[in-house]
Design a protein with these regions (language model features):
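Expand to "…catalyze enediolate/carbanion chemistry for C-C bond making/breaking, isomerization
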Residues: 3-4, 222-223, 229-262
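Short cationic amphipathic helices and targeting signals
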Residues: 63-67, 125-127, 134, 203
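An internal, amphipathic alpha-helical element
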Residues: 166-239
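An N-terminal structural lobe/cap that precedes and organizes the functional/catalytic core
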Residues: 2-107
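Internal, conserved structured core segments that host functional sites
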Residues: 110-176
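Conserved active-site and cofactor/substrate-binding residues in soluble primary-metabolism enzymes
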Residues: 67-71, 75, 107, 141, ...
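Generic secondary-structure signature for well-ordered alpha-helical cores
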Residues: 81-85, 151, 155, 207-212, ...
């Protein structure tokens, strides 16, 4: 089992924005959810503004909730339209991600990219179990194709380690992987979310570049956890927590898919 020796505890812009969107239930006060196309969106760019009964939705930072693409805007509108008597942020992972991106990523893209690089430096897929052999084989099955993709598509050659001992990655490999990071706040923010949810910047990058599906990515993330549950039985609390995180991961994957590689 792989245990990171580097603990990524940051107080960066993404974390600050996430704290501002902690779930609190509020009674639903609107009837209609609409999209106003061509209005000023994030950072003054044209986008698709979300409105409740004709009034623009504001983020916790008092910015306009506007998406850069029509499909993404429709997905956001669907979340708001699906709310019942109360507005439940837990059931709105895409809106929470959008708020985080708009409030926390736009003015801090270099810092967000640096956080992704930290994850890449001690990525999940670089650390393999010393035993048993069937677990090592399963890790290789899910993770080796990602390493091959990084080598062929990005020119990044990473080193593998066994157990819990940290393995320093070549600066050139990290530089080449980071050169594939997006430069707009929406995709960068979604990539950061996928990275922190999976513990793997490489899996997130592969998702961005269509080298892996969201379902396969999520399965790859849980190789070790699934193995343990097969050996010792399932943990209902852990599975419930995984379900919440999967919803958040799917929101990030949706942003990456709808906005494309650009």
């Amino acid at each position: 089992m792989r245990v990171l020796l580097e603990v990524h505890q940051t107080d960066g812009p993404v974390e600050a924005a996430q704290r501002a969107v902690r779930p609190t239930l509020r009674r639903r006060f609107y009837e209609m959810v609409t999209i106003a196309a061509g209005e000023a969106g994030h950072e003054g760019q044209n986008g698709y503004r979300l409105c409740l009964d004709g009034k623009p939705i504001r983020t916790p930072g008092r910015r306009t909730l506007a998406a850069p693409g029509a499909e993404l805007a429709r997905a956001l509108a669907d979340e708001w339209a699906a709310q019942g008597e109360y507005i439940d942020p837990v059931k709105m992972p895409l809106t929470r991600l959008a708020n985080t991106i708009i409030d926390g990523v736009g003015a801090a893209q270099e810092q967000v990219a640096a956080e992704i690089r930290k994850y890449l430096a001690s990525d999940l897929v670089f650390y393999r179990a010393e035993s048993p052999a069937p677990l090592r084989a399963r890790q290789a099955q899910h993770w080796d194709p990602l390493l091959s993709w990084a080598r062929q598509a990005l020119g990044a050659e990473f080193k593998l380690g066994a157990g819990v001992v940290h393995v320093a990655q070549p600066a050139a490999a990290l530089d080449r992987a980071c050169a594939a990071l997006p430069h707009d706040p929406w995709r960068l923010g979604a990539l950061h979310a996928a990275t922190t949810l999976t513990g793997s910047g490489l899996i997130a990058l592969a998702l961005l570049h269509d080298a892996i599906t969201a379902e396969a990515a999520w399965q790859a993330v849980h190789v070790d956890e699934d193995w343990n549950m097969e050996q010792w039985g399932s943990d209902e609390i852990a599975l419930k927590r995984r379900g919440f995180r999967f919803a958040e991961f799917n929101a990030a994957a949706l942003v990456l898919r709808t906005l494309g590689k650009l």
